[in-house]
Amino acid sequence: GFVFITNFQDHCKREDLRDVSLTLKLAGETVRFPQEGTVTVAKNANIILPFNMDLDGILLKSATLQPLARITSEGKKHYFFFAPEGMKPEYIFAENTVKGGTKKLIPVPGFNSTVRLKSITGEEILITTLTREQALAACKVTVEKEEKLLITSADVLQEDAKVRIQSTDTILKVVAFPAVRFITETSAKISKKKYCSEISFIKKGVHIFPEVHMASERRFLVHLPEGAFRDVSDLILSIDYIGDTGAAFINGEMVADNF
């Protein structure tokens, strides 16, 4: 199951809720968040905490971490969680489901947090704990029938069996789980680690200089030079103006407006 926690309310003063603990009285057992002590629920937080969650044969009794994604790659299941702001992260497992009797795991969130666990039936899983900021930048994709989790501030586009990443920055960084084996972009620099790859691309900036003509007091004409879309996928026109409304037209057809 899942516990939903929110510390947000419109039109009200919000503040961190400190020294919080939650106890669930279930049929035949009691589950506490956290197992010992207390946590802080940050203001504006919306949190989902799991209990009695089956991780492919390993029973996660409780966690002060929010589930994010599960990918399957090379036949292995890889689970991703992230740490809500203000909460000390912990995983509590049912000892009789984990080989070696691991009961409690206190991770340090980040790209190097991946751990390997094996169930008593021999099934092996990976668990990675991310920060909230990293989770917000995560995107699940499929490449050559293998699932991957990409973490990047850029736009990620799934195009059939390929993935395209685009950004307005000249330096683009991506962290990929699991570690990648092949990238078609020759300018990529790859730092391969045990469970992930850190990939960076450096591209030359593209500079477009449009011609702008003032047709009237409230109307401007913008002409793009020939070849403006060479080496780019999109051009973004940003206009600062003072007024109630604005509208943009291409060949007489309105393509954007602003109120």
Task: List each model region and its residues.
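Non-catalytic C-terminal accessory domains or segments of carbohydrate-active enzymes
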Residues: 1-259
